[in-house]
Amino acid sequence: MAEEAQYEYLVPLEKYLSAGVRLGTRLSNKYLEERGFIYAVRPDGLRIFDIKKIDERLRIAAKLIARYPPDRVLVHTTRPYGFKPVQMFCKFVGCKALTGRFIPGMLTNPNLSNYLEVDLLFVVDPRLDSQAVAEAAKMGIPVVALVDTDTPHQYIDFMIPCNNKGRKSLALIFWVLARQVLRERGELKPDQDLPVPPEEFETRLVQT
């Protein structure tokens, strides 16, 4: 417990909690359980992630992403709540953003007009973004992914366990990652923040 109390999170623990980053689903991937990512199960069956492990994986992911030329990293999501976070992340970090439909062949068919040459693929949800993941695996492109408690882990080279469905969770995750990648590159000082708060990464709900 003393060691846990001394651990310094990338953002205050309260921020992670209020954004719901640790909230999983009622379904569970045994592989994630074996890796120790799932901390507890609530009485209603909802799985809860270990926030310390989320934080640790974000640190490692930032180091990994920072090693690649930004224009050789593709960040993809088909989840609407992920559009704004991905676009903002790529704006600050310089990666390629692909939101919405992934056209088959974009990573495997050089004859396509929208063919992309990338060295690293980062997806928000391997289940929804399965076409991109499958093509990356076929081409030998490493895959980083946000994974929920029920996410399939096949072809994922590096997993970041978290709530990959929530609006606030995705905003905070990508804000933290963007800041940490820039710190790893030396473009931000170790104690320096992005010029915008996490809320600017959040998808806005439109009233109809």
From Swiss-Prot:
Similarity comment: family membership: Belongs to the universal ribosomal protein uS2 family.
CDD domains: RPS2
Keyword Ribosomal protein assigned: yes
Any single Gene Ontology cellular-component annotation: small ribosomal subunit
Superkingdom of the source species: Archaea
HAMAP family documented for this protein: Ribosomal_uS2_A
Signal sequence extent: none
GO MF: structural constituent of ribosome
Organism: Pyrobaculum calidifontis (strain DSM 21063 / JCM 11548 / VA1)
Record has Transferase as a keyword: no
Protein name: Small ribosomal subunit protein uS2
Alphabetized Pfam families for the sequence: Ribosomal_S2
Keywords: Ribonucleoprotein, Ribosomal protein
GO BP field: translation
Originating gene: rps2
Cited PANTHER family: 40S RIBOSOMAL PROTEIN SA
